[in-house]
């Protein structure tokens, strides 16, 4: 996990779905777990960032990413 990825997770906006418009770090853990259970994270960089976000949330590290948010 790179610093750049943490910054992206803090600032990337979910582009689709029920939580469209929310930052990845603000997505509910249950939503990310749903993708994991289905083994259907989106392809590419978004899916990779979502998987890392899930790891951050399940390990209780969300507070480390929150300060990296830029104003919208």
UniProtKB/Swiss-Prot annotation:
Taxon lineage: Bacteria, Pseudomonadati, Pseudomonadota, Gammaproteobacteria, Enterobacterales
InterPro entries assigned: QSregVF_b
Encoding gene (name): ypeB
Protein name per UniProt: Uncharacterized protein YpeB
């Amino acid at each position: 996990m790179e610093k750049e990825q943490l910054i992206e997770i803090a600032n990337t906006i979910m582009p689709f779905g029920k939580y469209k418009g929310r930052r990845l770090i603000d997505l509910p853990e249950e939503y990310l777990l749903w993708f994991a259970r289905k083994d259907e994270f989106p392809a590419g960089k978004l899916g990779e960032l979502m998987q890392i976000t899930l790891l951050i949330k399940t390990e209780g590290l969300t507070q480390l990413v929150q300060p990296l948010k830029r104003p919208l």
